[in-house]
UniProtKB/Swiss-Prot annotation:
One of its GO terms (molecular function) is peptidyl-prolyl cis-trans isomerase activity. The gene is CPR6. It comes from the Eukaryota. This is Peptidyl-prolyl cis-trans isomerase D. CDD domains: cyclophilin_ABH_like (cd01926). GO terms for cellular component: cytoplasm; intracellular membrane-bounded organelle. It is found in: Cytoplasm. It comes from Cryptococcus neoformans var. neoformans serotype D (strain JEC21 / ATCC MYA-565) (Filobasidiella neoformans). One of its GO terms (biological process) is protein folding. Belongs to the cyclophilin-type PPIase family. PPIase D subfamily. PPIases accelerate the folding of proteins. It catalyzes the cis-trans isomerization of proline imidic peptide bonds in oligopeptides.
Length: 375
């Protein structure tokens, strides 16, 4: 790649969060790209001899469904910053449009007021065309952009500090090595995950093609299973849910889809849902995890052509979640349904007895309370 490859190492609340890697569009806006490049390297000073650099500065303004803004290394509040050409420099051109998420564009206070501040789009922003200069894009770790985008804010400032701990530029050899490592990991059989968390951010795969989405989801399932066997239930849950997001690009396949493809989607989606539910059940109990299990298993139960054992498993896991939610009536109903599907299952029988005993004890307690009130 002939264009410059730059990076930010990011911390969130002073904890390492990962690296954002950018391609700068030197071929279209060389002056603007050069400004960003040298602010990443930190090898320039202003007339007063003060170092000009992004390292140590923060993202001071983040608006979900719009953009993340940073680059004010002098004041940190959006009123400062300085370019390598002086305090401000002109708009180079508006050839590139804000037609997609993950673009780098210059923040400004009007025409010809570019400094060091920039923003990363998280959605298409065509209303900014002709006003802000697009000069790059995020190429790796777009999931980190989404993570930052979803941090709660106060007056648009992230409640957790999002800091550029270090920044720089990759040499062509370093970038070639990075690409080779990614390709080897993708081609390998070790279950590596190199895909973005959200299908719409992944450029290496066309998730709109069912076959490609299926391949990614299958590999992510392998990663999740590996993590599950290692006892890393939170990580496994994350991988299973990520795999579901790739499958869910196609909630329903076209009517003319091959029967084999339809069955492949069904037979992969089902274990992803039930395995994710199992992972959530193994995490510390909370209203969020139990609600997630109910949601996942309820989805599983809507899938076509479920076998008796598949239906029984989903009902049993949903019943476990209802127990955590203290909804014993719903749990008992699901357990009785599960027992019809898998007669004699020891786990189902035990939990059903426990639930029935709890309901009986509760009814007796209520009876005694009423007796005292009206006795």
């Amino acid at each position: 790649m002939s264009n410059t490859i730059a990076y930010f190492d990011i911390t969130i609340a002073n904890e390492p969060a990962g690296r954002l890697t950018f391609e700068l569009f030197d071929d279209v806006v060389p002056k603007t790209a050069n400004n960003f490049k040298h602010l990443c390297i930190g090898d320039k000073t202003n007339e007063a001899g003060v170092k000009l650099a992004y390292a140590g500065s923060s993202f001071h303004r983040c608006i979900k469904g719009f953009m993340l803004q940073g680059g004010d290394f002098t004041r940190g509040d959006g009123t400062g910053g300085e370019s390598i050409y002086g305090e401000k420099f002109e708009d180079e051109n508006f050839e590139l449009k804000h037609d997609k998420p993950m673009l780098l564009s210059m923040a400004n206070a009007g025409p010809g007021t570019n400094g060091s501040q920039f923003f990363i789009t998280t959605v298409p922003t065509p209303h900014l065309d002709g006003k802000h200069v697009v000069f790059g894009r995020v190429i790796y770790n777009r999931s980190l952009v989404r993570r930052i985008e979803n941090i709660p804010t106060t007056s648009d400032r992230p409640d957790q500090a999002v800091t550029i701990s270090s920044a720089g530029v990759l040499s062509p050899d370093e970038f070639a090595q990075l690409e080779a490592e990614r390709q080897a990991k993708q081609a390998g059989s070790d279950g590596g995950d190199i895909w973005e968390d959200w299908p719409q951010d992944e450029e290496g795969v066309d998730a709109e093609k069912p076959e490609e989405a299926l391949v990614v989801a299958g590999k992510l399932k392998e990663v999740g299973t590996k993590e599950f066997k290692a006892g890393n239930f939170a990580v496994a849950l994350d991988k299973y849910q990520k795999a579901l997001r790739y499958l869910d690009v196609h909630p329903v396949l076209p009517n003319d889809s091959p029967a084999e493809l339809v069955e492949s989607f069904r037979s992969l989606r089902l274990p992803l849902l039930t395995n994710a539910a199992l992972c959530a059940l193994k995490l510390p109990a909370s209203p969020n995890t139990s609600s997630l299990v109910v949601s996942l298993t309820s989805r599983a139960l809507t899938l076509p052509n479920l076998s008796a054992s598949e239906k029984g498993k989903a009902l049993y896991r949903r019943a476990q979640a209802y127990v955590l939610k203290k909804d014993d009536e719903a749990a008992e109903k699901d357990l009785k349904g599960a027992l019809e599907c898998v007669p004699g299952d020891a786990g189902v029988i035990k939990l059903l007895k426990d639930v029935e005993a709890k309901r009986k004890a509760r009814r007796e307690k209520e009876r005694q309370a009423f007796a005292k009130m009206f006795g």
